[in-house]
Swiss-Prot record:
The keyword ATP-binding does not apply. GO terms for molecular function: chlorophyll binding; electron transporter, transferring electrons within the cyclic electron transport pathway of photosynthesis activity. The keyword Glycoprotein does not apply. Pfam families: PSII. One of the components of the core complex of photosystem II (PSII). It binds chlorophyll and helps catalyze the primary light-induced photochemical processes of PSII. PSII is a light-driven water:plastoquinone oxidoreductase, using light energy to abstract electrons from H(2)O, generating O(2) and a proton gradient subsequently used for ATP formation. Belongs to the PsbB/PsbC family. PsbB subfamily. InterPro entries: PS_antenna-like, PS_II_antenna-like_sf, PSII_PsbB. GO terms for biological process: photosynthetic electron transport in photosystem II. This is Photosystem II CP47 reaction center protein.
Amino acid sequence: MGLPWYRVHTVVLNDPGRLISVHLMHTALVSGWAGSMALYELAVFDPSDPVLDPMWRQGMFVIPFMTRIGVSKSWGGWIITGDTSTDAGIWSYEGVAAAHIILSGLLFLAAIWHWVYWDLDLFRDDRTGKPSLDLPKIFGIHLFLSGVLCFSFGAFHVTGLFGPGIWISDPYGLTGKVEPVDPAWGAEGFDPFIPGGIASHHIAAGVLGILAGLFHLSVRPPQRLYKALRMGNVETVLSSSIAAVFFAAFVVSGTMWYGSAATPIELFGPTRYQWDQGYFQQEIERRIRLGEAENLSLSQVWSKIPEKLAFYDYIGNNPAKGGLFRAGAMDNGDGIAVGWLGHALFKDREGRELFVRRMPTFFETFPVVLVDGEGVVRADVPFRRAESKYSVEQVGVTVDFFGGELDGASFSDPATVKKYARRAQLGEIFEFDRATLKSDGVFRSSPRGWFTFGHTTFALIFFFGHIWHGARTLFRDVFAGIDPDLDAQVEFGAFQKLGDPSTKKQAV
C-alpha cells in the first residue's frame, strides 16, 4: 500500500496481536535502556565522596531513581552513604540493572512470538467469528492490575513490611538514608515534603484503582456513551493513554523542579528556589547564632558547620545556573569540589562586618558589592576606578576565614580580598579540581534540571498528541469519510487509511 513514514503505525490499528507485539517491543527497549544505562553509570560513578562529589554532581540520572526507592548497596562493596558493604544481596544496583536487562530479553522474545502468532482465537468474537477487542473490559483489567501494583508499593515496599522503604532525609539533605515510612493519614499527608504521604497516597490510589477496575469489569458502558466516546476504536485508547501520560509528566516536572519528598536533594541536587530564598544560608546563620549563644569562638562555631550544608549553599549547585544545552555533568563545569576553604568574613577599617551581595540565579556576571548589616553599601569592586568611592583599597577591606581549610587565615592585600569577594558572590567558597575532567568553568545543570526540561517538553508534545488522536477518533467519519459504526475487518495495515480505495466507507 506504500504508507509514508509518518503513517506506519497504522499497520497495527486493527491487528490486536501485532499491537501487543509492538508494545512488548517498546517495553523491552525501555527496560533494556534502563538496565544498560544503570550499568554504564555504575561504571563511571565514583562513590568515594558522597559529600562533595555526590551522584548529582557527577551527572547520574538512573542511580538517583534507584536509590530513592530503596536500592543503596553495590556488588562493588560500597554503599551510597559512603560506608562499605560485604553483602549487597540480589537487589543491589547491579542486580536491579541485570533484572531489567533479563526482563528486556524476555519481552523481546515475547514480542517476536506475538508478531508471528498474531491471529489468535483470543481476539475473535465467539458470536460473530470476527476479530474484536472488548476495550472497556481491557481497560478494567489494566486499571485493576495497576491498582494492585500501586497499593502493594505503598502498603509493602514503602512501609517496609516487604521491602526496604524509601530514601528519607531531613529538610536540609544532611542525614539521608533508606528506611521504612509510616503512612500519613492526616492533613500532613498532603504536604509534598512529608514522606508519609507517599505511602498513604499509593495505598489510597491503589484501593481506588482496584475498585474502579472491578467496576469496569462488571459494569458495561451505556450504549450512547460507548458510541459518543468511540469506545470501540483503539485510537480512543491511544488518545486517553496519551492524556494520562502527559498529565503525569506535567505533575512530575513540578515535583522535581519545585522539590518534594519524592525528589530528595541528596539524590537530585538542590532546587533553584533554595538558592533564591537563601534557604541553606539561613540554616547556617541559625546554627551560628546557637553556637555564639554557647560562647563559642567564631572559629569553633564555623568548624561545626557540616561541609555538606556549606556545599549546598553554593550557586554552582543551582540547577537553573546551567544552560539547558550545555552537555555534561556539573563536575564538567566548575570542576570536582575538593574542599571548603571556610567562611569569609569581610570588615572595613572601621571594624564594620560587611556582606557580599550574592549573585541572583539568572546573572552570569554581577557587580561585587559589600554592604553592612543595615544594607548600606560600604565597599565594592568598581567598574571605573577613576570614579570609585568605595573600592576595597579606599575602604580598607580585610577578610578573615573561619572553619574549613583556611581557618584562622586573614588577608588584607587588596588583590586577595577582591579575589575572595568575587568568589563569595557565589556563596560559600570551595576549592575545585578542574584538571582531572578538563572542566571548562561554565556552570552545568543537575539531573533535576534535565528531568524537568525533558518531561515538560514531552508533556507539551504529548498534549498535542492527545488533541490530535482524540479529534481523529471522535470525528473519524468527518475526516476519513468512514462510517463510525463500520466494523468490517480486513487485512492488517489496509484498513481505514486516508486515501485508500480498498477501505469500505459504509456499513452494509
